[in-house]
Amino acid sequence: MEEKEFKSGFVALVGRPNVGKSTLMNYLVGQKVAITSNKPQTTRNRISGIYTSDRMQVIFVDTPGIFKPHSKLDDYMDKASLSSLNDVDLVLFMVEPEDMGKGDQYIADLLKEVKVPVFLVINKVDQIHPNKLLPIMDSYHKLDGFKEILPISATQGIGIDDLLNTIYKYLPAGPQYYDADQITDRPEYFVVAELIREQILRLTSQEVPHATAVVVDQMNKHQNGKLVIEATIYVERDGQKGIIIGKGGKMLKQIGIDSRKEIERLLGEKVNLRLWVKVQHNWRSDPSFLKQIGYDKKELG
């Protein structure tokens, strides 16, 4: 039997907010490396998930959802999405199983300038009857620019084998860039900060989640064997600080409990998590503060 050629490459996940890019990446790598929520703009930074098998290694670049910017942070997120298309081997343009709206069309127009193959990936097909999916797929087939059109469900695993087989077909032969057990290119403290932010997204509402940034100040082993993590939650106004802390500190305690469970699951060890809340007025439009907490445009090349 002929041995399969080993292939490797970088694949960008692109689409509107909340189409399931992070969910797909987490499914493919088998562990949570990108946070998810039902709120727009959950992903802020580029983060890569690494899928390795005996025939290929794929570095999936999960980008912030593309939308029209309203603040410096929004502008950073949009540039983070678009910059990831400059140096990848494939682009997966993710949409929901519905007719193409203005947001999708905006992205489709941007992708016409991309020089690498673009796959249209229709996610959440488990949420629609097959009879309704077929005409939607037909309408997408009439559009130019897509090398492949693939229906999947990132939560149920539907169509994932076909997706991986198709990616393999298009990838170039190449080396294994990362160890087989490495699942992300981001350091642990980055993923830990994101897991805390995920719980804030889940537990708070209105403007509070989007006015929040999390910075891990230190991660140190304690004498009792527990890992001690100290992190600061930044908000823009005193009122938001009060909401994060909650009556009698209840909300902050709940954020801490739920975050600790996710962090322990990720790291596989007991964690002592200590959280502080600070006000940094209008941080989303403050370039120097954005740089200080890791939203550095130098990263965008």
Curated annotation (Swiss-Prot):
It is a peripheral membrane protein. Residues 123-126 are annotated as: G4. Residues 152-154 are annotated as: G5. Residues 196-281 form the KH type-2 domain. This is GTPase Era. The gene is era. Residues 7-173 form the Era-type G domain. It holds the Pfam family KH_2.
